[in-house]
């Protein structure tokens, strides 16, 4: 392997280093590209209006990706960035944010498969800065997301979904989800609701999966988010095995503050979603009773 560093030099030196990187990339089996923000781009009084990768790094990435499409990107960042081009031209992205003193060792172990990435995104990554703010628990509008007309919630030049959504993350195996099972179809105040689902590891390697439970209150006296994360469990599943993941919800999980700022329970229909991330669509319904 060969290591190349320090591309943020004067223009002439930068061009020479990029040309050298291209020559090496042409012969390489795989390119590991470490890119991202400067450490000073984050922290107190470090807001940005431009969430692109720095221009110098974009030049390097475009030049290398033009001669080698087997790129693994390691991303150092303080915030969600515009990764459209990086995502399209990378076989994988390992988002490490800004790790501590043992970060380098952990990154190497993950890249070589000695350990597996198990993290999940705590924020959405937009497709462009024009999509901001973008978050999974937005409020619904009077225009649906999909409809056979132009009067919908969305954009004419981009999908409405973020590039990477809240709760997303991959590892070195694959999981399949079964059907959601609820222990009751009607919930009264003072009772609990148990929701369960079977998760199977369909890969050839043991792994951990973070199973996430979201709810949606369809009808309420105030507008409620399209999804709310209420529970999650990180479970180990051996290759080829299936585990049953169970969640217990209490009445407080369905309460909210009304317009009088009272913490209330309102009868109505609740959808229970369980899946890999906030984009999950499979659900079962429970009715909140008087």
Protein language model features and the residues they cover:
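Secreted, periplasmic, or luminal enzymes acting at the cell surface/secretory milieu
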Residues: 1-9, 76-208, 214, 234, ...
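Short acidic, flexible loop segments centered on an aromatic residue
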Residues: 204-221, 227-229
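Domain-level signal for soluble alpha/beta catalytic cores
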Residues: 21, 193, 203, 220-222
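Intrinsically disordered, low-complexity Pro/Gly/Ser/Thr-rich segments with frequent PxxP/GP/PP motifs
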Residues: 221-257
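Hydrophobic helix-and-loop "lid/oligomerization" segment in the mid-to-C-terminal part
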Residues: 2-88
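Terminal connector regions
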Residues: 250-290
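Short, contiguous acidic/charged loop-to-helix segments that flank catalytic cores in large enzymes
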Residues: 45-55, 59, 95-99, 185-187, ...
């Amino acid at each position: 392997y060969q290591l190349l560093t320090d591309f943020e030099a004067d223009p002439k030196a930068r061009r020479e280093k990029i040309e050298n990187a291209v020559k090496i990339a042409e012969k390489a089996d795989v390119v590991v590209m470490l890119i991202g923000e400067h450490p000073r781009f984050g922290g107190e009084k470090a807001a940005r209006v431009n969430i692109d990768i720095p221009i110098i790094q974009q030049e390097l990435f475009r030049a290398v990706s033009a001669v080698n499409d087997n790129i693994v990107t390691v991303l150092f960042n303080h915030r969600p960035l515009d990764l459209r081009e990086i995502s399209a031209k990378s076989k994988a992205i390992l988002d490490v944010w800004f790790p501590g003193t043992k970060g380098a060792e952990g990154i190497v172990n993950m890249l070589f498969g000695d350990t597996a990435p198990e993290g999940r995104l705590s924020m959405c990554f937009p497709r462009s800065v024009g999509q901001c703010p973008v978050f999974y628990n937005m409020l619904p509008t009077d225009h649906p997301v999909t409809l056979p007309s132009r009067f919908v919630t969305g954009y004419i030049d981009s999908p409405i979904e973020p590039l990477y959504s809240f709760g997303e993350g991959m590892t070195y195996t694959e999981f399949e989800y079964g059907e959601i099972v609820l222990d009751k179809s009607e919930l009264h105040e003072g009772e609990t609701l148990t929701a369960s689902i079977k998760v199977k590891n369909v890969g050839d390697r043991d792994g951990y999966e973070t199973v996430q439970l979201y709810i949606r209150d369809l009808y309420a006296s105030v507008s409620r988010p399209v999804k709310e994360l209420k529970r999650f469990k990180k479970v180990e599943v051996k290759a080829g095995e299936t585990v049953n993941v169970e969640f217990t919800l209490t009445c407080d999980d369905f309460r909210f503050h009304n317009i009088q700022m009272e913490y209330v329970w309102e009868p109505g229909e609740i959808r229970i979603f369980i899946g890999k991330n906030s984009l999950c669509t499979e659900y079962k319904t429970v009715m909140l009773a008087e």
